[in-house]
Design a protein with these regions (language model features):
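Extracellular beta-strand-rich, repetitive "passenger/adhesive" scaffolds
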Residues: 3-11, 26-34, 49-57, 72-79, ...
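Structural signature of tandem-repeat unit edges
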Residues: 8-22, 32-45, 54-68, 77-92, ...
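Surface-exposed repetitive/solenoidal architectures
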Residues: 29, 115-159, 248-251, 259-262, ...
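Extracellular, surface-exposed repeat/solenoid domains
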Residues: 81-120, 522, 541, 547-553
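Active-site-adjacent structural elements in enzyme catalytic domains
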Residues: 220-321
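Compositionally biased Ser/Thr/Gly- and acidic/asparagine-rich
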Residues: 257, 265, 292-307, 311-611, ...
C-alpha cells in the first residue's frame, strides 16, 4: 500500500513474492539503506515513487510479468547503474522515465533480444541513452499490443516460454487513425521453430457489432470495452505449443456464430462461471436443401467433436454479467490440434446437397480458420456469402468482389457451394492483425475477377426501425440472368428473432439478399417484414447513375431515393410482399436520350427506359411531352 515501508532506514534487502501483483505509490519511499530488491514473476503494476530516493540500489531487474511502470517508481535512485527489463512488451509508463532525476549517461538498460526497437521507441524507456541485449530468455510473455517475434536461429530447443495474448486498458491511436484499446497482436517469424509450453488467446466474434451505435454497414467495432476485443496470431515461420487455451467471449441472450482453429470436443468448452447456461448447435445442410426448416439446427452433446474450420451457433446466459466467458481447449490426439499455428493456405471442404430450388442448395456453415482477422477478398471464392449480425440479429450478405469484409477470429459464416467447387481455400495473404480493410488494386482473386466481368452497378437499400437495421442489394449486370444464380445471387435468410425488421427483393417467389440481374424493365419487387408495429425507413446508400424511385402501392406514393432522401412509412406487424416496387431509371437509355420533338409530335407516352408504350393502364411513372407523369 501507499507509504507501507516509507522512511524505513533498517531495511537493506527486499524479496517480493510472486503473490504480490501491485506495488503502490511511495510504498518504499526513501528507504535509505535498501541495497537489493528481488522481484518475482507475477508482479504486474509498479506505481509512482514506489522506491523514491533509494540511493543505495545499484541494479534493478524487472520481471517479465510487469505491465505498468508508471510515475517514475525509481525516482532519484542515483546509485543505479544497470536496469534489466525482462518484459518482451515494454511496460507502459506515464511518459516519464522509470528512473527519473538520475544521470542516465551512467546507466545501461538491458532488454530481450526481440524487443530492442520497442524499448528505444517506447515512452519513458526511450530516455535511456544506452540499450543493450540481455542474455535472459523470458519464460513469461504477455502480448497486449502489436508485437513481431523473430525467432533467433540459435534459440535452444529447451526454451519453451508461456505466451499469454490478451487485451490492455491502454488506449492508443493506430495507423488508421482510430483510437482503440490495445490488444495482443503477435506475428511470429524466423527459420527456427518456436516451441511454447502454454499459449492462451482471446476470441470474441461479437465484438465487431457495436451495441451503442447504429451504422449503415450493419456492424462497427465496440472500442469502449477492453475485455471483448479479439487478439490476433499470425505465424509466418514454425510454431508449436504443448497446451493451448482459447478464452471465448460471447454476448448473453443472443445467438453467436462461432468457429474454432482446431478440433474441439463439446465437453472441452468450459464456462468460467458455474452459473452460465449455454447451448451449441450444428448446421444440417441436407435438411436446409430439403426445405425442412425445423431440422436445420442440430443440438450437440458433450461427446460431439466440433471440426476445425466448420461453423456452429452458440447461445448463453450469465445472470451477473452482459457476456459470458468460456475456456476452450483443443481435442487432444487430433491431427488438427496444431492447425492454430498454420503458416500456409487453409482449405475447407464444402458439402453438396441437391435441392428442388437452387436458392436452398448446398449451403455450408464454415468459419475463419485462422486465429487472426481475415480479409474475405483473399478467399478462393467469388460468390456471395452470408454473415450473422449478432446485434441486429439478422443475416447480411456480402460479395468478395464488391465488399471488403473483414472476418473476425472465431467468426463463422454461410456460403453456398457453387457448381464444380468442392472446397474454399483461404489464402494466407488474407491474414491480418487488425480489423480494417486494406487498400489494394486487384490483388485479391475475387476483386480481379470482378474487374474482368461486365459492368456491374450496385444498389444497397436498408430498412431501419429505431436502432435495428437490415440490408438488401440489387446488382445490375448484363451478363446475369433473371433466374437465381448461386455464383451471383444470395437468398434471404429469415431472422430467428420475430421482432427484427427485414428487407429483401422478390423474383419468381424467391426472396433475395443479393439480387444480381440484367436491367430488363428496371422494375424490382421489394418486400419487407415488420416485426412490430411502428415507423420504418427505407434508405439508399449511394446513387450510381440511375435514379431510384420507390413506389408505395398502399399509400399511392412515389419517392425518389437518394443519399439525402429516404422514405419513412408506418406499418403493422407482418409481411408486405406486394406493397413496394423499385423503379430504376437507366439514364444511359432513358429519358435524357428520348427525342423530345418526336414525343411532342404525336403526344406519345414513354416509360422510364425510353420505350414507347401504348397505354397507361398500369400504375407507374411515365414520360409525356418531356415531363414525368405519375399514374396512380
Amino acid at each position: 500500500n501507499n507509504y507501507s515501508f516509507a522512511d524505513n532506514s533498517a531495511l537493506d534487502s527486499l524479496f517480493i513474492p510472486e503473490t504480490v501483483t501491485t506495488i503502490n505509490s511511495n510504498a518504499f519511499y526513501n528507504c535509505s539503506s535498501l541495497k537489493n530488491v528481488q522481484f518475482s514473476e507475477g508482479l504486474v503494476n509498479l506505481y509512482s515513487n514506489a522506491f523514491y530516493n533509494c540511493k543505495q540500489l545499484s541494479e534493478i531487474v524487472l520481471p517479465s510479468s510487469l505491465e505498468k511502470c508508471e510515475g517514475a517508481p525509481f525516482y532519484g535512485c542515483s546509485g543505479v547503474k544497470k536496469v534489466e527489463a525482462r518484459s518482451v512488451i515494454p511496460p507502459t509508463t506515464s511518459g516519464s522515465c522509470p528512473l527519473s532525476n538520475v544521470n542516465l549517461n551512467d546507466v545501461v538498460l538491458y532488454v530481450p533480444s526481440w524487443s530492442t526497437s520497442e524499448y528505444t521507441l517506447a515512452n519513458g524507456w526511450s530516455s535511456f541513452y544506452t540499450v543493450e541485449v540481455s542474455d535472459f530468455m523470458p519464460q513469461y510473455i504477455k502480448v497486449n499490443k502489436d508485437f513481431y517475434f523473430t525467432v533467433r536461429d540459435t534459440v535452444s530447443s529447451d526454451y519453451r516460454p508461456n505466451i499469454s495474448m490478451t487485451y490492455s486498458s491502454v488506449e492508443s491511436t493506430d495507423a488508421y487513425g482510430h483510437s482503440n484499446y490495445e490488444r495482443g497482436n503477435l506475428t511470429v517469424s524466423g527459420r527456427s521453430k518456436l516451441a511454447v509450453n502454454d499459449l492462451s488467446i482471446v476470441v470474441s466474434p461479437f465484438a465487431k457489432y457495436y451495441s451503442d451505435h447504429n451504422v449503415a454497414n450493419g456492424y462497427e467495432y465496440d472500442n469502449y470495452r477492453t475485455n471483448i476485443n479479439s487478439t490476433s496470431l499470425i505465424v509466418n515461420g514454425e510454431m508449436r505449443a504443448e497446451n493451448v487455451r482459447m478464452d471465448l467471449n460471447n454476448y448473453n441472450s443472443r445467438w453467436q456464430f462461432v468457429t474454432f482453429p482446431f478440433d474441439v470436443k463439446v465437453s472441452d468448452i468450459v464456462p468460467q462461471k458455474e452459473t452460465t447456461s449455454w447451448v451449441i448447435r450444428g448446421h444440417n445442410s441436407a435438411m436446409r436443401a430439403a426445405g425442412k426448416v425445423d431440422s436445420v439446427w442440430v443440438n450437440l452433446t458433450a461427446d460431439d467433436v466440433l471440426e476445425a474450420g466448420k461453423g456452429y451457433i452458440m447461445h448463453n446466459y450469465q445472470p451477473d454479467y452482459t457476456n459470458s466467458w468460456f475456456w476452450v481447449y483443443p481435442l487432444k490426439n487430433s491431427v488438427n490440434r496444431q492447425l492454430i499455428f498454420s503458416s500456409e493456405d487453409r482449405t475447407i471442404e464444402l458439402e453438396e446437397n441437391l435441392a428442388e430450388f437452387d436458392h436452398n442448395r448446398s449451403w455450408n456453415l464454415i468459419g475463419n480458420p485462422y486465429p487472426c482477422f481475415y480479409d474475405s477478398r483473399f478467399m478462393d471464392f467469388d460468390a456471395p456469402f452470408m454473415v450473422w449480425n449478432s446485434y441486429n440479429q439478422n443475416y447480411v450478405a456480402y460479395n468478395p468482389a464488391d465488399d471488403a469484409y473483414i472476418l473476425s477470429p472465431g467468426e463463422a459464416f454461410f456460403v453456398q457451394r457453387p457448381f464444380e467447387q468442392e472446397s474454399i481455400t483461404f489464402r494466407k495473404e488474407g491474414r491480418q492483425t487488425h480489423r480494417y480493410a486494406r487498400e489494394m488494386e486487384l490483388e485479391a482473386p475475387a476483386r480481379a475477377k470482378a474487374a474482368s466481368n461486365n459492368v456491374r452497378t450496385i444498389y444497397n437499400l436498408t430498412l431501419q426501425q429505431d436502432t435495428l437495421i437490415d440490408r438488401t442489394r440489387v446488382v445490375f449486370n448484363d451478363a446475369a440472368t433473371l433466374a437465381y444464380e448461386m455464383s451471383r445471387d444470395a437468398a434471404k435468410f429469415a431472422s430467428t428473432e420475430r421482432n427484427v425488421p427485414q428487407i429483401f427483393t422478390i423474383a419468381d417467389k424467391t426472396r433475395y439478399a443479393i439480387n444480381e440481374r440484367p436491367f430488363a424493365n428496371g422494375e424490382v419487387a421489394l418486400g419487407v417484414y415488420c416485426g412490430t408495429e411502428g415507423e420504418f425507413t427505407i434508405s439508399l446508400d449511394k446513387t450510381y447513375g440511375c435514379k431510384v424511385i420507390l413506389e408505395d402501392k398502399l399509400n399511392n406514393s412515389f419517392v425518389e431515393l437518394s443519399v439525402d432522401n429516404s422514405y419513412t412509412f408506418s406499418a403493422l406487424a407482418g409481411e408486405y410482399l406486394n406493397r413496394f416496387v423499385l423503379h430504376f431509371e437507366n439514364e444511359a437509355t432513358g429519358v435524357d436520350n428520348i427525342n423530345v420533338d418526336d414525343m411532342n409530335a404525336d403526344d406519345a407516352i414513354y416509360n422510364l427506359q425510353g420505350i414507347k408504350v401504348n397505354s397507361t393502364n398500369n400504375k407507374g411513372i411515365y414520360i409525356k411531352n418531356g415531363q414525368k407523369t405519375i399514374i396512380k
